């Protein structure tokens, strides 16, 4: 066992982005440790388990840190490989039969697709306590990785998307008030433009995944219009067509943000060419008059991992968030989020051990204490007091409460069939940004026709 301590194979190519455990699960992990220790160093010592995904930067470092105590206790070597084209490459690997032990997808819809094609191993075959899993991660999240009653997906990280980043001091200095409704936000944007500045940062270039930021805007709007969560769920499952009037209304509201003169720093050219990880940078710089480049940035909680080093410590204080504004006040509050879901390609003993650890609350203990961590545990029992970053305590509590109240909804594009959610939806949002509001009908009709 000693020789395996602190061993970690970590291979990354070009990068783009894209807790308290229940007692039975803790006992099972401790039993695993005792069993391995009783076997003269452990029958799994030196076994390598491979994982592929799209984690980058500080996210990849946190993912590595999560496995350190597990590797120390079991002797299993966890190897992670990331790629800027993970979504495309994992398809090639599955079709060729040359798969890793796990894939970590940011799209549960891709997990379902892989399961439907016969590539994934059910969690039951990994000896996972399914009741425990559902209790710890909510029936909603578990359902996202379920096909015909069989659970294939393991929930991992979560992030909150229904937030807008801003700097309170910059608002206060100019007498701006945090908006609570869409109309308030538009009025504030108009005031900022009238004052000679740009209200929004907005950049959605992401190499092969360009366009997903606009889909996030669409999803937040969909949750707050029409019939709220009910119509959102119908949209995701295609009970509601993509060119339905409710969806067109959402696209029209999004177009207001993208195409109103002066709203976005750099205009539509910047929207389609600015790397999403750098999109908020103008907020952190000042012009000759001391004005920031933008005042609001609608982006998920993970974005702090992409901020300039000098700004990360101010997350939750100097730069914090307000909830995405309500649009129809008659609808109950809802929270949009995203996250990672893994699938396993075999049921080796080492794979089973890693799967059980990844579903434990303790999996995130070593991640949470990192000051640069921007990922949040999706485990409803995770001890959020462990988060080192002040903003993570706020966001972590919000996610846990939303999951418990069944008001949390996953990113729609990540739930749709890959050819739509990670294909035509992304592409047509890029086209919409370039072509303008007159392209809305064409964009929605094109996406509708692409649905398999």
Label each PLM-derived region with a short phrase:
Residues 150-156, 186-240:
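Extracytoplasmic/periplasmic solute-binding protein
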